[in-house]
Amino acid sequence: MADTIQSLDQLSALKPAESEAPKHTKKVDKYGRAYATGKRKDAVARVWIKPGAGKILVNAREVDVYFARPVLRMMIQQPLVAAARAGQYDVVCTVAGGGLSGQAGAVRHGLSKALTHFEPELRGVLKKGGFLTRDSRVVERKKYGKAKARRSFQFSKR
């Protein structure tokens, strides 16, 4: 009990413990690919990236074929554009569950996480853009005694 602190001066004189924040390291498999999973609504995407010509495959199909709407394709490209890495990585992903919008969001989330595994220094840029945060908004459940989640049945006064 000899190292009990008796005053504020002793407390302020103490040096902080050497506990650094964990360093993010490059995580790639034996094939040189970075892997991550992304989620959005009910969709789950498994994403692999490796250096390449910028080809994006979704469920073994070109991104232009799988996501016909330009807005969805733009959503997937956002992390690469924000990190100034468009056209530098080949992306292969499998996505299941949900609709097309949820699937595009899941691919975007997984792609962002895979980019940080491949290049940890991009984490700040992607975090600032909000690409690494899991969007927790999901469909509200239906309640009994109601037509839908919040909509009541039609009310007749008489």
From Swiss-Prot:
Cellular component, GO annotation: cytosolic small ribosomal subunit
Xref: PANTHER family: RIBOSOMAL PROTEIN S9, SMALL RIBOSOMAL SUBUNIT PROTEIN US9M
Name of protein: Small ribosomal subunit protein uS9
Gene3D superfamilies from the UniProt entry: 3.30.230.10
GO terms classed as biological process: translation
Listed GO MF terms: RNA binding; structural constituent of ribosome
Family per similarity comment: Belongs to the universal ribosomal protein uS9 family.
HAMAP family: Ribosomal_uS9_B
Keyword terms, alphabetized: Ribonucleoprotein, Ribosomal protein
Native source organism of the sequence: Nitrobacter winogradskyi (strain ATCC 25391 / DSM 10237 / CIP 104748 / NCIMB 11846 / Nb-255)
Keyword flag Ribonucleoprotein: yes
